[in-house]
Protein backbone atom coordinates (compact mmCIF):
# COMPACT_ATOMS: atom_id res chain seq x y z
CA UNK A 1 0.00 0.00 0.00
CA UNK A 2 1.59 3.31 -1.02
CA UNK A 3 1.25 6.48 1.00
CA UNK A 4 0.77 9.73 -0.86
CA UNK A 5 0.62 12.97 1.08
CA UNK A 6 0.27 16.60 0.12
CA UNK A 7 1.17 19.60 2.23
CA UNK A 8 0.05 23.17 1.88
CA UNK A 9 0.66 25.96 4.33
CA UNK A 10 -1.42 28.97 5.27
CA UNK A 11 -0.04 32.05 6.99
CA UNK A 12 -1.13 32.32 10.59
CA UNK A 13 -1.03 34.90 13.36
CA UNK A 14 2.13 36.12 15.16
CA UNK A 15 4.49 34.72 12.55
CA UNK A 16 3.24 31.14 12.89
CA UNK A 17 2.16 29.16 9.84
CA UNK A 18 -0.30 26.29 9.89
CA UNK A 19 0.65 23.28 7.77
CA UNK A 20 -2.26 21.19 6.52
CA UNK A 21 -1.43 17.66 5.43
CA UNK A 22 -3.65 15.38 3.40
CA UNK A 23 -2.83 11.70 3.50
CA UNK A 24 -4.14 9.29 0.88
CA UNK A 25 -4.58 5.54 1.25
CA UNK A 26 -4.07 5.58 4.99
CA UNK A 27 -7.47 6.57 6.23
CA UNK A 28 -5.88 8.46 9.15
CA UNK A 29 -6.86 11.98 9.99
CA UNK A 30 -3.96 14.43 10.15
CA UNK A 31 -3.69 17.11 12.83
CA UNK A 32 -2.52 20.57 11.70
CA UNK A 33 0.99 21.47 12.89
CA UNK A 34 2.11 24.89 14.05
CA UNK A 35 5.55 25.93 12.85
CA UNK A 36 7.37 29.27 12.90
CA UNK A 37 7.05 31.26 9.70
CA UNK A 38 10.02 31.80 7.44
CA UNK A 39 12.43 34.77 7.51
CA UNK A 40 10.88 38.12 8.27
CA UNK A 41 7.83 36.45 9.79
CA UNK A 42 7.87 38.35 13.05
CA UNK A 43 9.61 38.25 16.42
CA UNK A 44 9.52 35.86 19.33
CA UNK A 45 6.19 34.88 20.79
CA UNK A 46 5.91 35.97 24.42
CA UNK A 47 3.84 34.07 26.95
CA UNK A 48 0.92 36.07 28.39
CA UNK A 49 2.28 35.73 31.94
CA UNK A 50 5.56 37.36 30.86
CA UNK A 51 3.78 40.22 29.04
CA UNK A 52 1.92 41.40 32.13
CA UNK A 53 5.08 41.43 34.28
CA UNK A 54 6.82 44.02 32.11
CA UNK A 55 6.86 47.29 33.99
CA UNK A 56 8.82 50.46 33.82
CA UNK A 57 11.74 50.85 36.23
CA UNK A 58 10.62 52.24 39.56
CA UNK A 59 11.73 55.54 40.90
CA UNK A 60 13.78 55.00 44.06
CA UNK A 61 12.05 57.95 45.70
CA UNK A 62 8.51 56.69 45.09
CA UNK A 63 6.29 55.47 47.91
CA UNK A 64 5.64 52.18 46.11
CA UNK A 65 9.39 51.51 45.85
CA UNK A 66 9.92 52.27 49.55
CA UNK A 67 7.00 50.03 50.53
CA UNK A 68 8.34 47.17 48.41
CA UNK A 69 11.84 47.59 49.88
CA UNK A 70 10.40 47.66 53.40
CA UNK A 71 8.35 44.49 52.78
CA UNK A 72 11.38 42.82 51.24
CA UNK A 73 13.59 43.81 54.18
CA UNK A 74 11.02 42.43 56.62
CA UNK A 75 10.80 39.18 54.65
CA UNK A 76 14.59 38.84 54.62
CA UNK A 77 14.75 39.54 58.36
CA UNK A 78 12.02 36.96 59.03
CA UNK A 79 13.79 34.39 56.84
CA UNK A 80 17.11 34.92 58.63
CA UNK A 81 15.48 34.63 62.06
CA UNK A 82 13.74 31.44 60.96
CA UNK A 83 17.04 30.06 59.70
CA UNK A 84 18.81 30.92 62.98
CA UNK A 85 16.01 29.32 64.99
CA UNK A 86 16.21 26.17 62.90
CA UNK A 87 19.98 26.01 63.44
CA UNK A 88 19.52 26.45 67.20
CA UNK A 89 16.83 23.76 67.30
CA UNK A 90 19.09 21.40 65.36
CA UNK A 91 22.00 22.07 67.72
CA UNK A 92 19.76 21.46 70.74
CA UNK A 93 18.55 18.18 69.22
CA UNK A 94 22.14 17.12 68.53
CA UNK A 95 23.06 17.75 72.17
CA UNK A 96 20.02 15.80 73.40
CA UNK A 97 20.92 12.86 71.17
CA UNK A 98 24.54 12.95 72.38
CA UNK A 99 23.38 12.80 76.01
CA UNK A 100 20.98 9.96 75.23
CA UNK A 101 23.75 8.11 73.41
CA UNK A 102 26.06 8.45 76.43
CA UNK A 103 23.33 7.12 78.75
CA UNK A 104 22.67 4.17 76.44
CA UNK A 105 26.39 3.35 76.15
CA UNK A 106 26.68 3.39 79.97
CA UNK A 107 23.65 1.08 80.18
CA UNK A 108 25.25 -1.27 77.64
CA UNK A 109 28.43 -1.43 79.74
CA UNK A 110 26.42 -2.17 82.88
CA UNK A 111 24.32 -4.87 81.19
CA UNK A 112 27.42 -6.43 79.60
CA UNK A 113 29.08 -6.59 83.02
CA UNK A 114 25.91 -8.11 84.54
CA UNK A 115 25.75 -10.69 81.74
CA UNK A 116 29.36 -11.66 82.37
CA UNK A 117 28.70 -12.14 86.11
CA UNK A 118 25.59 -14.23 85.41
CA UNK A 119 27.49 -16.40 82.92
CA UNK A 120 30.22 -17.01 85.48
CA UNK A 121 27.61 -17.95 88.12
CA UNK A 122 25.87 -20.27 85.67
CA UNK A 123 29.12 -21.99 84.69
CA UNK A 124 30.11 -22.36 88.35
CA UNK A 125 26.72 -23.85 89.18
CA UNK A 126 26.88 -26.16 86.16
CA UNK A 127 30.35 -27.30 87.25
CA UNK A 128 29.10 -28.02 90.76
CA UNK A 129 26.15 -29.99 89.39
CA UNK A 130 28.44 -32.02 87.16
CA UNK A 131 30.76 -32.74 90.09
CA UNK A 132 27.81 -33.78 92.30
CA UNK A 133 26.37 -36.05 89.62
CA UNK A 134 29.76 -37.60 89.03
CA UNK A 135 30.37 -38.21 92.74
CA UNK A 136 26.90 -39.75 93.18
CA UNK A 137 27.48 -41.91 90.15
CA UNK A 138 30.83 -43.03 91.55
CA UNK A 139 29.28 -43.82 94.94
CA UNK A 140 26.50 -45.87 93.29
CA UNK A 141 29.01 -47.81 91.25
CA UNK A 142 31.09 -48.51 94.32
CA UNK A 143 28.03 -49.45 96.36
CA UNK A 144 26.79 -51.76 93.58
CA UNK A 145 30.17 -53.45 93.51
CA UNK A 146 30.08 -53.97 97.27
CA UNK A 147 26.53 -55.34 97.13
CA UNK A 148 27.39 -57.76 94.34
CA UNK A 149 30.14 -59.35 96.43
CA UNK A 150 27.91 -60.08 99.34
UniProtKB/Swiss-Prot annotation:
Annotated stretches, region: Disordered: 27-94
Any one GO molecular function term: RNA polymerase II cis-regulatory region sequence-specific DNA binding
Gene3D superfamilies: 1.20.5.170
Leucine-zipper, as annotated region: 97-118
Biased composition (Low complexity): 28-37
Protein keywords: Activator, DNA-binding, Isopeptide bond, Nucleus, Transcription, Transcription regulation, Ubl conjugation
Stretches assigned to the bZIP domain: 62-125
Region annotation Basic motif: where it falls in the sequence: 66-93
GO biological process, one term: positive regulation of DNA repair
UniProt crosslink position (Glycyl lysine isopeptide (Lys-Gly) (interchain with G-Cter in SUMO2)): 3
Keyword Chaperone in annotation: no
Superkingdom, taxonomy of origin: Eukaryota
Annotated compartments: Nucleus
Record function comment: Transcription factor that binds to the promoter and the enhancer regions of target genes. Binds to the enhancer element PRE-I (positive regulatory element-I) of the IL-4 gene. Binds to the promoter and the enhancer of the immunoglobulin heavy chain. Binds to GPE1, a cis-acting element in the G-CSF gene promoter.
UniProt similarity note: Belongs to the bZIP family. C/EBP subfamily.
Assembly description: Binds DNA as a dimer and can form stable heterodimers with CEBPA and CEBPB. Interacts with ZNF638; this interaction increases transcriptional activation.
Protein name: CCAAT/enhancer-binding protein gamma
Name of encoding gene: CEBPG
Amino acid sequence: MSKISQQNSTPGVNGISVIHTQAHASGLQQVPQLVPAGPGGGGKAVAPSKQSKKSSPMDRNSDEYRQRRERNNMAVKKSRLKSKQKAQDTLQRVNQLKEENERLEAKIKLLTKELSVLKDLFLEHAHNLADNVQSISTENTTADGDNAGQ
